[in-house]
C-alpha cells in the first residue's frame, strides 16, 4: 500500500490510533481506555477529522488525526455518520433510540424528535436482550446520491426510513422476521437496491417498503454483520460485495463455549450467489469480524477488525483483537502487525 494511512481501532478497552510508517506501523495515541468504543466515522474531505462514540459517555471529535479529542455530545453513543456530500453534517444515534444531527461539525446539535413519534406498533419492537433492555440506533445510512434519504438500523427493532432528513419516518422492516438489524447500504450505481445484514439473515430489496427477501445462496452461515462493496472490475459488471458472517449469534457462542466460527464471503453478481473468501485466514475464525473498511486511497484494499466480544453489548471485558488486511478485493489476507484488545469498529483515513 503506497499511500499513507492512519487506522483508528475502537475496542472493548478504548481507542488506539496507528499510522503506517516505513513499511510498518507506529502507534500514535491511545484514549478512552476505561470506555467501550461502539462507533467511528471520519470526514471525506478532511481526513484529519474523525468522530468516536464512547458508550455511556459521549461523542468526541479530533481535528488533528487522533492526537487530541474534544467531547461534543453527551450520551450513550452507538452510531455516527458523516453526510457523504458535506463534511459539516453529522448524524449520531444513541441508546435509548434517538437521533441527532449537527450542521457545524458537531459544535451544536438538534434532536430529530419525529423518530419517537412512530406508532407504538413500531416502537414496541425497540428493545435489547441485555439490561436495561433498551434498543439503540446501530447503523445510520445516508444515501450518497440523495442525502435527504436516511435509513436507521435499530438493534433490536427493525429498519426505519426518512425521505426528508429525519422530519418524518416510516418503518420498512417487512420480510425480516427477527429484527436484530446491524448494517444497511445501497448497491453503488443502483439507487434503489439495498442490502441488510442482520443477526438472522442477509436480505435485499429494490423497494424496502414492499419488503425484503433473503440473499444467502452459498453463504452457509446465519449471522451477518458488516459488509462493503468493491468497484466493478469492468464496465457493465456489478460491484463485488464482501460480507462478514458467523455461525449463530453471540448468545449461542457463549452458551456453547465456543468462538464465532466467523468467515468472509464474496459475491460478484449482486448477492445472487456467494463464494468463500479469505485465503490466509483460518477456516473458522474464533473472533468475529466486526468491521470492514476500505483503504482510503486504494479501493481494492480492505482492512478487517476482529474481536472476541459481542457487539451491541456495552459491558463486559472481551478477549483479544486483531486487524487483517487484503490488497486484492478480499481474496487473500494477512495480519497487520499490531496488538489490540477485542476490536469493535474500525476507520481508515489518509495520513
Can you say where each PLM-predicted feature lies in the sequence?
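Extracellular glycan-interacting surfaces
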Residues: 1-351
Amino acid at each position: 500500500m503506497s499511500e499513507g494511512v492512519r487506522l483508528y481501532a475502537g475496542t472493548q478497552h478504548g481507542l488506539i490510533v496507528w499510522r503506517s510508517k516505513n513499511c510498518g506501523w507506529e502507534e500514535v495515541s491511545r484514549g478512552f481506555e476505561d470506555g467501550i468504543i461502539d462507533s467511528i466515522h471520519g470526514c471525506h474531505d478532511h481526513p484529519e477529522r474523525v468522530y468516536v462514540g464512547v458508550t455511556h459517555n459521549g461523542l468526541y471529535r479530533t481535528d488533528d488525526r487522533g492526537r487530541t479529542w474534544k467531547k461534543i455530545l453527551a450520551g450513550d453513543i452507538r452510531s455516527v455518520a458523516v453526510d457523504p456530500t458535506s463534511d459539516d453534517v453529522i448524524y449520531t444515534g444513541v441508546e435509548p433510540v434517538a437521533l441527532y444531527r449537527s450542521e457545524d461539525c458537531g459544535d451544536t446539535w438538534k434532536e430529530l424528535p419525529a423518530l419517537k413519534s412512530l406508532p407504538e406498533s413500531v416502537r414496541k419492537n425497540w428493545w435489547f436482550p441485555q439490561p436495561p433492555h433498551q434498543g439503540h440506533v446501530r447503523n445510520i445510512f445516508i444515501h450518497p446520491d440523495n442525502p435527504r434519504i436516511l435509513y436507521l438500523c435499530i438493534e433490536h427493532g427493525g429498519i426505519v426510513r426518512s425521505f426528508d432528513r429525519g422530519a418524518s419516518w416510516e418503518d420498512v422492516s417487512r420480510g425480516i422476521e427477527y429484527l436484530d438489524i446491524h448494517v444497511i447500504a445501497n448497491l453503488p450505481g443502483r439507487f434503489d437496491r439495498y442490502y441488510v445484514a442482520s443477526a438472522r439473515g442477509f436480505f435485499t430489496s429494490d423497494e424496502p417498503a414492499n419488503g425484503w427477501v433473503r440473499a444467502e445462496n452459498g453463504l452457509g452461515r446465519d449471522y451477518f454483520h458488516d459488509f462493503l462493496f468493491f468497484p466493478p472490475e469492468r464496465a457493465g459488471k456489478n460491484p463485488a460485495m464482501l460480507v462478514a458472517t458467523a455461525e449463530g449469534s453471540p448468545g449461542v457462542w457463549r452458551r456453547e463455549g465456543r468462538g464465532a466460527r466467523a468467515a468472509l464471503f464474496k459475491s460478484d453478481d449482486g448477492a445472487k450467489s456467494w463464494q468463500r473468501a479469505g485465503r490466509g485466514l483460518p477456516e473458522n475464525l474464533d473472533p468475529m469480524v466486526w468491521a470492514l473498511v476500505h483503504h482510503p486511497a486504494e479501493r481494492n484494499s480492505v482492512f478487517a477488525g476482529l474481536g472476541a466480544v459481542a457487539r451491541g453489548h456495552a459491558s463486559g471485558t472481551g478477549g483479544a483483537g486483531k486487524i487483517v488486511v487484503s490488497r486484492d478485493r478480499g481474496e487473500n489476507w494477512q495480519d497487520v502487525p499490531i496488538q489490540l484488545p477485542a476490536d469493535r469498529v474500525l476507520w481508515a483515513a489518509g495520513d
